[in-house]
């Protein structure tokens, strides 16, 4: 189980919340069942991408639209525990933005520096990626972009 802080960022649920949940669930359990409530792991991410804008479009304006769309895609309300990240779907979402000719690069990396406010949970994104799908760990975890203003970085490429 996880909770939100005042900025709608994920955090571990406090013991009172877990105890209340345990009491509520105990009304529905069988006599031999046990209720074990654990915190999920928060894996903080950063996203880097590059786009080529269509001729006649302002690169910076198109880039800002792409960043806004990524913020929307990674809004924490849209995600569930143990949901994989399908990079192809994200690239398609960016490709569909008006003014984007193509997405040149799209990469996701782990942000785990506790001193910078991240969860401290390191996750090897490269090893967990197969066929452009980032799979979560077997332990309950959720992917989060904690600071969208700085964790989503894009650039315009021209040839």
Where are these regions (language model features)?
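Acidic, low-complexity glycine/serine/threonine-rich segments
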Residues: 1-159
